[in-house]
A protein has these predicted regions:
Chain B
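A short beta-strand motif that forms part of the nucleic acid-binding face
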Residues: 33, 67, 76
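Charged, alpha-helix-enriched surfaces in structured cytosolic catalytic cores
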Residues: 75, 89, 117
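Acidic, low-complexity mobile loops and tails
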Residues: 1-59, 92, 96-127
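Short, charged/polar surface micro-motifs in flexible loops or helix N-caps
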Residues: 37, 77-80, 86-87
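Conserved hydrophobic positions within beta-strands
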Residues: 14-17, 63, 72, 77-80
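Short, charged beta-turn/beta-strand-edge "cap" motif at the junction between a beta-strand
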Residues: 60-61, 66-67, 86-87, 111
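Short, Lys/Arg- and Gly-enriched loop/turn segments at beta-strand edges
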Residues: 64-73, 90-93
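Residue-level recognition of beta-strand microenvironments
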Residues: 17-20, 66, 83-86
Length: 408, 127
């Protein structure tokens, strides 16, 4: 029901979704698959076998230049210059008040080349902020929005390693050898190059394949064919949301916002105030860059400096040691009616004391689950609260996050 | 494409009605395949209770999927005489057999309803 004047953006895989009969939905300005077969079947496939996702709406922002690492150290709250080559890192961009601009996954593709993956809804603002912050800090680094040139295809679920392994060309490194939150350039059958990361947003093992938009359909079809015998099915954004919520993962616009600091969200660990940074010395350019692979050696041009200023540092330092005003908790109910985002958390007298940020009937647990911001006094595991579910108070209790954790 | 069988009547809120809609008659009510598809997998149905007085166009229950919650509107005015107890344990019948085993409740009409749509008119609404 889009009333936007600009037409929705389309993934390079749009025709594939149409031919598979997907129900499409408008999401952050993109026309993306909501579901193919059914939300619960897709959710269950990822928990028990594998699911195939088109995530091409996510923003891929390439940060390059001699100062790329130092520039990101300044622009983001994490310590990007300490990343090993081919590592992935979950981090955030905050504003000067410590409010979250976006949560991000950053991949180090070379010593002077990072890929910042932003939420679709924040892509343009993150790109603009990165450029502005690099400029303000006087860094020799550039931002390039490559979203339109790339497709992001995710294979998620316990069978993901076997499926992605079978997509790779003979003689290529086995994706199963990749550590969680690391990546590699791999050659796929058919001669397509893919940047393959062992990352995801489902609480299961999984891989994300960044490939050129021009070869996306080929890779997508290969994955469907290779995965069929493993139980892989195409999955839409509805199941991605229910999977991430069971896994206790925050979603921007729900658990995270400009009114929320990383500490409010229980993610203060992403903020690095201290520590030595290892940055490239821009006075010694031109040394041989390491090639593709799983190497984690330190670049010979690197120099060590102390973690310095970053946007939001002062505000975040002020709240880091304070008791937070609100705490993000997990809630489980024994009834059947599920809370949804925006519903009021109430105390015994029915007064609103908090707010639900996400809620669903959990397909895996068979109970309603929710994440909510509550006062610290109601945040202890076992605390009973009420949720105003469409006019009726439903009892729920605070549980430790995540709701679902896969067996190791 | 969602099926819209001939011979049923339909409301603007995507309920179907089977039976004669004149006072004193009893009709069966469910949600259309179009509505079920839009909602996704239904995991919980809260129907009205037997004996409830329902009014055409008023909310009388709710349906919940993993993705969303939707209010259930009564397409007719009268007294609820029966609800589909099978949906308690198998709410997904609303998706798999929207016009058959996925029926939700039955109403004995206290007044007629001239506002319901036939299959063609409802089909136009869903295009």
């Amino acid at each position: 029901m889009s009333t936007a004047e600009t037409p929705a953006l389309r993934s390079p895989l749009h025709e594939e979704h149409v031919s598979l009969g997907a129900t499409m939905t408008e999401f952050a300005g993109w026309d993306m698959p909501l579901r193919y077969s059914g939300d619960v079947a897709e959710h269950t496939a990822v928990r028990t076998a594998a699911g195939l996702y088109d995530l091409s709406h996510m923003g891929e922002l390439m940060v390059t230049g001699p100062d790329a690492a130092a520039a990101l150290d300044y622009a983001l709250v994490g310590h990007m210059s300490r990343m090993r080559l081919w590592a992935a890192k979950y981090t955030m961009m905050c504003d000067a008040n410590g409010g979250i601009v976006d949560d991000l996954v950053v991949y180090r593709r070379d010593w002077d080349h990072f890929m910042v993956v932003a939420n679709a809804s924040n892509r343009i603002e993150v790109a603009r902020e990165l450029a502005a912050r690099f400029d303000a800090g006087g860094f020799d680094a550039a931002v390039s929005d490559e979203t339109a040139a790339l497709a992001l295809i995710a294979v998620q679920g316990p069978a993901a390693a076997a499926i992605v392994g079978s997509l790779c060309a003979a003689g290529e490194a086995e994706p199963a050898g990749l550590k969680y939150y690391s990546a590699a350039n791999l050659l796929l059958e058919g001669g397509h190059h893919a940047f393959v990361a062992r990352t995801g947003y489902t609480g299961e093992d999984g891989f994300e394949l960044f490939v050129g938009a021009d070869v996306a359909a080929d890779v997508w079809r290969s994955a469907l064919a290779a995965g069929a015998s493993h139980g892989l099915i195409p999955c839409g954004l509805a199941s991605r949301d229910s999977l991430r919520l069971e896994a206790g993962m925050p979603l921007y616009g729900h658990e995270l916002s400009a009114d929320t600091t990383p500490f409010d969200a229980g993610l203060g660990r992403v903020v690095a105030f201290e520590g030595p940074a290892v940055v490239l010395s821009s006075s010694q350019p031109g040394a041989a860059a390491p090639g593709a692979g799983l190497s984690d050696q330190v670049d010979p041009r690197a120099v060590s400096v102390e973690r310095g200023a970053f946007v939001g540092r002062e505000a975040l330092a002020r709240v880091a040691d304070q008791a937070p005003g609100k705490v993000l908790v997990g809630l489980v109910g024994d009834g059947r009616r599920s809370p949804r985002a925006g519903y009021a958390v109430t105390d015994e007298d029915g007064r609103q004391v908090g707010i639900v940020t996400s809620g669903i009937p959990s397909p895996t647990l068979g109970q309603p689950i929710a994440m909510a911001y509550v006062p610290p006094t109601l945040a202890e595991v076992g605390t009973e609260v009420g949720i105003d579910v469409r006019g009726r108070r439903e009892p729920m209790r605070v549980v430790a996050l995540p709701f679902y954790k896969r067996q190791a | 494409m969602a099926e819209i069988p001939d011979g049923l009547l339909y409301s603007e809120e995507h309920e179907w009605v089977r039976g004669d809609v004149s006072p004193g008659a009893t009709v069966t009510v469910g949600i259309t395949e179009y509505a079920a598809e839009a909602l996704g997998d239904v995991v919980y149905v809260e129907p009205p209770s037997v004996g409830d007085e329902v009014r055409a166009g008023d909310v009388c229950g709710e349906l919940e999927s993993t993705k969303a919650v939707s209010e259930l509107y009564s397409p007719v005015t009268g007294t609820v005489t029966e609800v589909n107890g099978q949906l308690e344990n198998a709410p997904d019948m609303v998706n798999s057999d929207a016009y058959g085993d996925g029926w939700i409740f039955k109403v004995e009409l206290s007044e007629g309803n001239e506002d319901l749509l036939d299959a063609d008119a409802y089909g136009e609404k869903t295009e």
